[in-house]
Amino acid sequence: MPLPLGDPLALAVSPQLGYIRITAMPRWLQLPGMSALGILYSLTRVFGLMATANWSPRGIKRVRQSLYLRIHGCVMLIFVGCFSPFAFWCIFQRMAFLRQNRILLMIGFNRYVLLLVCAFMTLWIHCFKQAEIIGCLNRLLKCRRRLRRLMHTRKLKDSMDCLATKGHLLEVVVLLSSYLLSMAQPIQILKDDPEVRRNFMYACSLVFVSVCQAILQLSLGMYTMAILFLGHLVRHSNLLLAKILADAEHIFESSQKAGFWPNRQELYKGQQKWLALELWRLLHVHHQLLKLHRSICSLCAVQAVCFLGFVPLECTIHLFFTYFMKYSKFILRKYGRSFPLNYFAIAFLVGLFTNLLLVILPTYYSERRFNCTREIIKGGGLAFPSRITVKQLRHTMHFYGLYLKNVEHVFAVSACGLFKLNNAILFCIVGAILEYLMILIQFDKVLNK
C-alpha cells in the first residue's frame, strides 16, 4: 500500500499538547520496517488485492489503477471460486482425520470451507470495489497535503512528514511476523503428512488453502496500514488544533495587556480572524478524515466479520486439541503416554491472535484520537473571553463544537452493523474462547474418567 514514509526520524510527543521532539531513528529498526512494508505491498499485488500502477510503496504521488493488475485480480477471483470445491473434496478424501466422526468433520468445515468462502468474498470485494479502494488512498494523500499546508511551524511540518516512527515500523514488522507465524500449521501438515508425498493434488490443495488464508489476512493488513496512516493524520490534526487554540489564548492575553490602544486592538482582531480561517480549514480536513475513516472501515467490514468468526473457532479448537493430546486420560490409556506440545500449533495460534489484535486495536485507538479532538476544543474554548473575541472566531468555535458533538452519531462505524471493533469485542472474544474451552475440557473429563 503506498504510504509516504518521509524522513527516517522518530517522534516523541510529550503529554503537553503541541510540543514535539524529533529524534534519530535507529538504522536497525528502519531497514526491517521498510523491508516489511515493501513485502506487504508486493504481496497485495501478487494476490490480486491491489491494482495500483505504482511499483514503490514510497512517495506521495497520486495512485493510479493498473489494467493489467485489475485483470489479474479477476483471474484470481475466478481461480479461487473454481478450485475451492475441488480443493476441499481432495482434502476430505485424503485427510482421514476429517472422516472419523461428525465433530471432526465440522472442524474441517471451519478450517477449510469457511476459509475458502471468506477468501472468495475478499477477492470479490477487492475486484469490484478496487476503484473505491484506490480512491480512499488518493483521498488519504490529499488530506495529508492539505493538512501539511496548514502546518505553520517547522516542527509540525517535520512531524507531519515523518511516518517512519518506531511505533509504526514496529507495527509493520509485527504484522508481517504474524503472517509468518500463522503459516506454521500448514507448513507442519505439508512436512509431516505422508499423503503429501503420495498425491500431488492433495499437496497443491493444502497450499491453496494457505494462500486463501493469506488473502484474508493481507486484506485486513491493508486495512491496518490505512488506519495507521489515518491515525497519523488525525494525531497531527489534533496537534495543530491545540497549537491554534494556544495561539488564540496568547493573542487574548496580549490584547488584555495592551489596554485601549486602537492600532494594537485592530492588529489583535486581525490575528483572531486569521486564526478563525485556519480553524475553519482545519475543520474541513477533520471532516474529510472522518469520512475516510468510515469508508475504510466499511470496505473491510465483511473481511473483519469473517476473521472475527474464524480466529476464535481456530483458537478454541487448537487449544482443546493441545490439552487433549497432552493431558486427556483417553490418550494415556490408548498410547500409554502423552504427546509433547505441538509448537507449530502454538505458533499458529500466536500468529492468528496477534493478527486479530492488529485489526481491532488500531481501530479502537483511531476512534480515541477522534474523541480527543472534542476534549481539545472543550478545553481551549473555555479560555476564550467573550468580550474581546471577534465574532468570526467565536462562531467558528461554536460550529466546531456542535459538529463534534453530533459527529459521533453521524459517523458511527461498525462491522456490517453487527458490532464495533474496540476493546470490548476483544474481551468478549477472549472470554468466549476460555468459556468454550472449559466446557470441552469438562466434557472430556466426564467421558474419559
UniProtKB/Swiss-Prot annotation:
Residues 51-70, 126-205, 322-340, 444-449 are extracellular. In larvae, is expressed in dorsal pharyngeal sense organ. It comes from the Eukaryota. It is found in: Cell membrane. The keyword Thylakoid does not apply. The chain crosses the membrane at residues 28-50, 71-93, 103-125, 206-228, 299-321, 341-363, 421-443. Keywords: Cell membrane, Membrane, Receptor, Transducer, Transmembrane, Transmembrane helix. One of its GO terms (biological process) is sensory perception of taste. InterPro entries: 7TM_chemorcpt. It is a multi-pass membrane protein. The keyword Manganese does not apply. GO terms for molecular function: ligand-gated monoatomic ion channel activity; taste receptor activity. Its main location: membrane. Residues 1-27, 94-102, 229-298, 364-420 are cytoplasmic. GO terms for cellular component: axon; dendrite; membrane; neuronal cell body; plasma membrane. Belongs to the insect chemoreceptor superfamily. Gustatory receptor (GR) family. Gr77a subfamily. Probable gustatory receptor which mediates acceptance or avoidance behavior, depending on its substrates. This is Putative gustatory receptor 77a. It comes from Drosophila melanogaster. The gene is Gr77a.
